């Protein structure tokens, strides 16, 4: 199967287990938990911070609480990576820290929520006021350097695009628009896009 392929909803790719739609459903369930935790933090008045619980490590950055609460609709990206074992992840974590430390400088960035799950895999939810706001982060030199290092730290990744019509902390569930699938087991990396379920 060539790079840059378009898949149909629900389609998996033989030999690439991470493309199994069941994995995306697991991701969406995890994102729902992450969002519920975000809502609980906002309602408690705590918003950002770092904490642990149930074997998980949470790190939440909210540049401006009012914008997070009031922005409607909102756009989100959910990231799930199949991390490489026996690798020093310090370099890419340092880049992440540097990028997120400048979160208030990125217009439209509502929240950055990173979770290390009990199984030692990573997931995060990044929320924006609008889809085009994500481009400002994507084009940042630090983010570009992190992208260049991704293959050293992950076997594969799934990036889910989400639309929150009722806002990031509203009551309505998000619309699942699409998933970008990237496999770093070959060079150049194999990529595919699969539509979501609306």
Placement of each model-derived feature along the sequence:
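Short, well-ordered beta-strand segments in beta-rich or mixed alpha/beta enzyme
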Residues: 76-81, 112-140
């Amino acid at each position: 199967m060539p790079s840059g392929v378009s898949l149909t909803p629900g389609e998996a790719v033989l030999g690439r287990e991470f493309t199994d739609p069941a994995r995306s459903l697991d991701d969406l369930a995890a994102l729902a938990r992450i969002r519920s935790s975000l809502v609980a933090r906002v309602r408690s008045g705590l918003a950002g911070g770092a904490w642990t619980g149930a074997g998980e490590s949470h790190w939440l950055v909210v540049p401006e609480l009012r914008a997070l609460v009031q922005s409607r609709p909102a756009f989100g990206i959910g990231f799930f990576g199949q991390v490489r074992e026996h690798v020093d992840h310090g370099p890419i974590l340092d880049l992440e820290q540097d990028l997120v430390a400048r979160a208030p400088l990125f217009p439209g960035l509502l929240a950055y929520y990173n979770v290390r799950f009990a199984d030692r895999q990573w997931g995060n939810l990044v929320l924006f006021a609008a889809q085009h706001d994500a481009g400002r982060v994507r084009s940042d030199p630090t983010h570009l350097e992190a992208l260049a290092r991704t293959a050293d730290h992950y076997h594969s990744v799934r990036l889910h695009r989400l639309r929150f019509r009722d806002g990031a902390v509203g009551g309505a569930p998000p619309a699942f628009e699409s998933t970008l699938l990237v496999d770093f087991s070959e060079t150049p990396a194999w990529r595919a896009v699969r539509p979501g379920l609306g």
